[in-house]
Amino acid sequence: KYLIYRDLKSRGYVVRGGFGWGVDFRVYERGKYGEVTARYLILSMREGKPISLEDLIRVLRQSQTLKKELVLAVMNRRGEIVYYSISELTLK
């Protein structure tokens, strides 16, 4: 988790602790800390470590309730971090 924190900080974001319930970090837009609420909620994980679909849906719904964008930060086996924006998909 620290490496993800450090990567976000190096990109110029303001990073604060998560709210609990599975979210690791709150991330504020560059230069906007204190002016607006966090735009992103970061859920961090390692490549190959499974997460249940139920847990992912629960965190996604909570982020939607808070009007935040959920981002999955995955650290791969080489130590690189890849970010995925998560949103709900409805099939009809």
Say what each PLM segment does.
Residues V14, R30, V59-L60:
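Catalytic micro-motifs at enzyme active sites that drive phosphoryl/nucleotidyl and oxygen chemistry
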Residues Y28-L41:
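Active-site beta-strand-loop-beta-strand hairpin of nuclease catalytic cores
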Residues L43-K92:
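Helix-rich interaction surfaces within compact, conserved domain-sized segments
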Residues G17-W21, Q64:
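A short catalytic or substrate-binding loop motif that flags glycine-/basic-rich loops and adjacent residues
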Residues K1-G18:
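Acidic-basic catalytic patches of nuclease active cores, encompassing PD-(D/E)XK
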